[in-house]
């Protein structure tokens, strides 16, 4: 599975939405703002679904992963396959969202 992971940069998080669930993020900020996110991983990983990604990036972190353990408010972008798109790590599972990756910091 070819993925990218984005995490909120605390220096850009003026509305304090890091680690907030999707509903609270939308209530506080009105959107999931890609401009406050930084890309912390981009590679092919040995995962079949988002639950595998969550496990891997909490228990078996790859050496090229520069972020914290995968948490609520992080965004996982799947770059290939039928589930291609951006997914918000929510309190329970993942939710597909609109996320302009070109606005996030690489």
Language-model segments: residues:
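Aromatic side chains
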Residues: 6, 37, 57, 87-88, ...
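Short intrinsically disordered terminal tails
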Residues: 1, 102-106
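Short, conserved turn/kink motifs that form compact alpha/beta structural patches or helix kinks used as
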Residues: 30-80
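Short, low-complexity, polar/charged sequence segments that are solvent-exposed and flexible
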Residues: 22-27, 97-98, 106
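Short, compact, well-ordered microdomains
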Residues: 66-103
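Generic recognition of cysteine residues
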Residues: 45-47, 89, 105
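Extended boundary segments
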Residues: 1-45
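Context-gated lysine
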Residues: 12-18, 56, 61, 84, ...
């Amino acid at each position: 599975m070819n993925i990218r992971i984005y995490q909120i940069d605390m220096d850009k998080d003026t509305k304090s939405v890091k680690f907030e669930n999707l509903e609270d993020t939308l209530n506080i900020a009105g959107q999931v703002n890609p401009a406050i996110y930084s890309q912390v991983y981009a590679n092919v990983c040995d995962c079949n679904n988002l639950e595998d990604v969550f496990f891997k990036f909490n228990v078996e972190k790859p050496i090229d992963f520069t972020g914290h353990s995968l948490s609520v408010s992080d965004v996982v972008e799947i770059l290939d396959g039928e589930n291609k798109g951006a997914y918000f790590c929510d309190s329970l599972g993942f939710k597909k969202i609109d996320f302009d990756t070109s606005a996030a910091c690489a």
